[in-house]
Amino acid sequence: MKAKIKQAMPPAFLAMYRRLWAMVHNLRLLRGLPPSARELYRLGVLTQYNVALLERDERVRTTVQAAAAAIYGDSWNYYSDALRPEIAEGFVRTVDAVAQTNQPVQYLEIGSCQGLSMSLIAGLLRDRSVLGSLVSIDPYFETGYIEGKAGPYRKAEQVAVTKNTKVCAMRLYAQLGLNVEIIERRSGDGLIELIRNARTFDLVYIDGSHEQLCPAIDFGLCNAILRSNGVLILDDHMWPDVQPIKHLCDKHAVKIQETWKTASYRFL
């Protein structure tokens, strides 16, 4: 019966009906989410982005995606979204800002997961002939970790980033010709180790634990290793415990870019 009704409807009317139904469905869905999650879901899931990267940058993005898909299969984007075009565009703007000196960029990433963002940013730096050292801090726990209870959706989730994830990430780096130093420790311990060794960086991406005091601790320690005029990227800045850090950056640093997922700042 429904099929016959659809066939009898003019195409324009049917399209309008589907748009209206989708709108009502999305409104109901949003009302069912915690208030802290509604804007994030709207921007990250419901919003369509028409982003076209420059050919050179799109080539880097698709190369990383193809390599990740070959290693991880259908789960290549697990717990990431780093290669979504609108997010990749933010990374491009960040890399362009830090590459202005035409000197090798020393890059530190806290929380590398499957290696997508590390590979993309490293590829963009290499394409601009400013690739320096690449360092990743990630504990890669045996059985993963639990996150989300204090997040926007107020729902704890078992995150399957394990020792096997590290092995696969290293395969990805090798396939892309990237030499990544992995510090397999919690972010606080890894950052203190870098401070003790007088290591400094031009670009730092904070993508560790987003809950409780972890974002504040990571941010404070990162300021000790960020070089003058260095650039810092905040991940998942719409999470409740990351928002105060973003407010500080908005007030005291120079914003380079902001997406629904990341925000980048230069510290003078």
Language model feature labels by segment:
Residues 2-268:
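A short alpha-helical cap/connector motif
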